[in-house]
A protein has these predicted regions:
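A conserved mid-domain beta-alpha-beta active-site/ligand-binding segment of alpha/beta enzyme cores
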Residues: 185, 196-230
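Structural motif
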Residues: 70, 249, 257, 323, ...
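Anionic N-terminal interaction surfaces
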Residues: 268-323
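Acidic, Ser/Thr- and proline-rich intrinsically disordered linker/docking segments
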Residues: 342-385
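Soluble catalytic domains of membrane acyltransferases
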Residues: 12-23, 28-198, 220-221, 236-237, ...
Length: 385
């Protein structure tokens, strides 16, 4: 049997060699393809904790271009279920798995363990990419973790990613993107800070409001396609799930029709909102009001949903299938019922993949047809709060 320490050392050496060979060619490609710029950053010797705002699915690649040592990434456990890509990631990178929609204390312990072994760890403390263009809230536990780690904390901000890879789209655009270190906190500084104070600092360091930046054209094709995975409530007729997209056009069966341009803004004769972020803020207020009624009757529903239980080896075990509903009382999928109070949280991966944790078990919900997962994510968040 191979010695785990020897195998671990071999893997780290392989990661260093891989980074040394590919970092500069990849950096050149990202500059050509996305107009991405960054610089190789000077960082403290030894392990450090790196906090980055989450803007695209390629964030680890963008971030890696700034550092000359391989990072260990905290990632959603779904990266272990991506076929051949997962095999490549396991061979040439190290990850710490975290289950979305859960309060994962195991991930926190693994982060501390990795730092104490001498390796730097990169994580995205918001856990979610922004739908609106404004950075999402940082997990409060992130500040406590940084203080407990007793290593330098580095905050790193990516800008332009929201338009480069809109959360609703599976197509990337070319405009302008940049990454840089915002601040380095020493262990001595962290030791005298209160978690609430540090949380405010981290939030400020990583915050981005994409629509407040100077407008830049982000060129691409089919700019509106899949926007209905983000915007599910029509401001004209007030109905849910009546919005559809095609190419650059976004419309409702009631007659509402707008186009989205290369600046991520709407165009048309009767545009209800300037951009998707404003539309989302409006529908959030409506969803909050819906949640406050806390009706026992279903508030949301979709047919053709499959529920899986996630085992420790990242296998999806079928549980049930059928209609999914969410009320103020419970989440129902097929013949499985989960009281709202038994669910720790609902996570959303990409545009429509839902996951949650209930009574210590992790679950994934898939759909046999395109459907909006964000409406469930939004409503559940307001029900719990």
């Amino acid at each position: 049997m191979d010695d785990p320490k020897i195998e671990k050392a071999k893997k780290e050496k392989r990661e260093r060699r891989f980074l040394k060979i590919w970092r500069h060619p990849v950096k050149a490609f990202l500059k050509l393809r996305f107009h991405y710029t960054c610089k190789t950053e000077s960082v403290p010797d030894g392990p450090f904790l790196l906090y980055v705002n989450h803007v695209t699915d390629l964030d680890p690649v963008f971030v890696a271009c700034s550092f000359d040592q391989p990072l260990v990434y905290v990632a959603g456990e779904n990266v272990q279920r991506m076929g051949k890509l997962s095999s490549l990631i396991r061979r040439y990178a190290s990850t710490i798995d975290r289950v979305k929609g859960s309060t994962d204390s195991i991930a926190a312990m693994n982060i501390l363990r990795t730092l104490r072994s001498g390796r730097p760890v990169c994580m995205f403390p918001s856990g979610n990419r922004s739908f609106s263009g404004k950075s999402t809230d940082i997990f409060p536990a992130s500040a406590k973790l940084a203080i407990a780690a007793k290593v330098p904390l580095i905050t790193y901000r990516l800008t332009g990613g929201y338009f480069t890879s809109p959360r609703w789209s599976d197509k990337m655009r070319c405009g302008k993107m940049h990454g840089e270190i915002v601040r380095v906190y020493t262990p001595e500084e962290l030791a005298i800070m209160q978690p609430e104070e540090l949380l405010r600092q981290i939030t400020n360091d990583l915050y981005e409001d994409a629509y407040a930046m100077e407008p830049v054209a982000y060129k691409g094709k089919k700019l509106a396609e899949r926007l209905e995975t983000m915007l599910y409530l029509c401001p004209k007729c007030g109905r849910i799930d009546t919005l559809t997209s095609k190419d650059d056009t976004f419309s409702c069966s009631c007659g509402l029709c707008v186009k989205i341009n290369e600046y991520g803004r709407f165009e048309g004769s009767n545009v209800p909102f300037e951009h998707p972020g404003m539309w989302d803020e409006w529908q959030q207020a409506k969803m909050k009001a819906l949640a406050s009624a806390a009706a026992e009757a279903p508030l949301l529903a979709d047919e053709g949903q499959q529920l899986y239980r996630l085992d420790r080896e990242h296998n999806l075990m079928p549980v049930t299938a059928g209609r999914m509903t969410l009320s103020g009382k419970e989440l129902v999928i097929g013949n499985s019922v989960f009281p709202v109070e038994s669910i720790d949280g609902i996570g959303l991966t990409q545009q429509d993949k839902l996951s949650f944790t209930s009574r210590g078990e992790n679950y994934v919900i898939r759909s046999d047809h395109p459907r909006c997962g964000k409406k469930y994510y939004d409503l559940f968040r307001y029900l719990k709060n």
